[in-house]
């Protein structure tokens, strides 16, 4: 049955597990066990916040291990969950990390990146609250440049009206704006470790604060461009940076969600001839242990505790098994959920049912050219057939196969749509077969291997 948007009664503890599942059903087909597991985990967070006294700190999240092939919805479930709750969400592949002491990123950068996301989220929220005031201040600065600070109130009011009406958008002015050139080269890059930077020692921030943040430069620009630069500048001045950082750290610590993908790739399979690789993979697992169990990570914003961050790990486990992970790591991922491979019926539902289904997306895109695209039921079934066939014969990449199928199917229409204004195009099973049969005949075609 098609999921529809529902209005829920206000619950002081947020959405109930069944409501969370209903919300996820709007975007994701099937995988009820996984949805149920994340819904319970989310509700338990709300429950924990209402527990009184010291017991609250002892209640830790039950981290989740999702097992399933690529493209079955593992990442999408976690991403939608974070969006639903406005939680800071960070996704990373486990293969990006190496053991501390080896070349590569260390696992603590996960928390530094999560906090960065939380800070940006809080800043954006704070800026929306001061947007009107910031816009007024920006207009005043532009008026100073246009008519001078000593101009009469009548003159300023007249030019202000012109700015608001957009009459002066293309007028060039000379105005002082903040110098955004990085001081000291930004974050300190660790030699021999590409992509790794010291979260605590950010030389750019330290030198910038020491010199003061009032460094400006005069530039010539159009009024509309000046507005785009000055409004964020004024917003920065109006918001309480220290308060935002504290709120962001609290948000990351209590509501943060970390999604570690491809965790099966760092499992030790016991294969011979790869001893160094085995050591490195096991080292990454050991580095993850304190992070998932609960530790304090130093960031440039201050120390961050990971005790109540929800960790969701996932992997296909085609070669390795969950039992190949270190026993200690298995113990820190107590909720284990297996996601089902997608069937033909699932593919049909994915094409049609979600609020942002692929069929709706492509129809909307082509619709911008004043071309009405319609898919017959027979076409949907045929597309699902082809997706399942290619997944079985080449490599199972789940629902992601539908993207490739549809791109090939609609390639000519997408190319010619601008010349077809006012037309209605019906995609039926014969059209699908004509477009895809030759490609499907050769299943080794590189364009079908994503």
From Swiss-Prot:
GO terms for biological process: protein unfolding; proteolysis involved in protein catabolic process. One of its GO terms (cellular component) is HslUV protease complex. SMART domains: AAA, ClpB_D2-small. Pfam families: AAA_2, MCM. A double ring-shaped homohexamer of HslV is capped on each side by a ring-shaped HslU homohexamer. The assembly of the HslU/HslV complex is dependent on binding of ATP. NCBIfam families: hslU, PRK05201.1. This is ATP-dependent protease ATPase subunit HslU. It comes from Rickettsia conorii (strain ATCC VR-613 / Malish 7).
């Amino acid at each position: 049955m098609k999921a529809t948007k529902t209005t829920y009664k206000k619950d002081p503890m947020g959405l109930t597990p069944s409501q969370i599942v209903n919300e996820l059903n709007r975007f994701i087909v099937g995988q009820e066990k996984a949805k149920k597991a994340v819904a319970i985990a989310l509700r338990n967070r709300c429950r924990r916040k209402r527990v009184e006294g010291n017991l609250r700190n002892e209640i830790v999240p039950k981290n989740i291990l999702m097992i399933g092939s690529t493209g079955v919805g593992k990442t999408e479930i976690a991403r939608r969950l974070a969006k639903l709750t406005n939680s800071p969400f960070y996704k990373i592949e486990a293969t990006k990390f190496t053991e501390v002491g080896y070349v590569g990123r260390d696992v603590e950068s996960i928390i530094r990146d999560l906090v960065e996301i939380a800070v940006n989220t809080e800043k954006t929220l704070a800026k929306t609250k001061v947007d009107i005031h910031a816009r007024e201040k920006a207009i005043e600065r532009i008026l100073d440049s246009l008519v001078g600070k000593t101009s009469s109130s009548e003159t300023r009011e007249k030019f202000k009206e012109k700015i608001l009406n957009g009459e002066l958008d293309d007028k060039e002015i000379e105005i002082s704006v903040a110098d955004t050139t990085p001081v000291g080269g930004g974050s300190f890059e660790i030699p021999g470790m590409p992509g790794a930077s010291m979260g605590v020692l950010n030389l750019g921030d330290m030198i910038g604060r020491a010199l003061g943040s009032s460094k400006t430069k005069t530039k010539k620009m159009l009024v509309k461009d000046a507005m785009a630069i000055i409004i964020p500048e004024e917003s920065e001045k109006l918001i309480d940076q220290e308060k935002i950082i504290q709120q962001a750290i609290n948000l990351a610590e209590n509501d943060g969600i970390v999604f570690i993908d491809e965790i099966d790739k760092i499992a030790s399979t016991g294969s011979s001839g790869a001893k160094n690789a085995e050591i490195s993979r096991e080292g990454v697992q050991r580095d993850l242990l304190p992070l998932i169990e609960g530790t304090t990570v130093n960031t440039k914003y201050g120390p961050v505790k990971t005790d109540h961050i929800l960790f969701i790990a996932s992997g296909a486990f085609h070669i390795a098994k969950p039992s190949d992970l270190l026993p200690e790591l298995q113990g820190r991922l107590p909720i284990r959920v297996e996601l089902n491979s997608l069937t033909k019926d699932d593919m049909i539902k994915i094409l049609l049912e979600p609020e942002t289904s692929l069929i709706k997306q492509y129809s909307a895109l082509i619709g911008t050219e004043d071309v009405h695209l319609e898919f017959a039921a027979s076409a949907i079934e045929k597309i699902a057939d082809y997706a399942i066939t290619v997944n079985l014969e080449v490599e199972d990449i789940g629902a992601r196969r539908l993207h490739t199928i549809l791109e090939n199917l609609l390639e000519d229409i997408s190319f010619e749509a601008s010349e077809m204004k006012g037309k209605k195009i019906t995609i039926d099973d014969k059209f699908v077969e004509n477009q895809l049969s030759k490609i499907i005949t050769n299943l080794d075609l590189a364009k079908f291997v994503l």
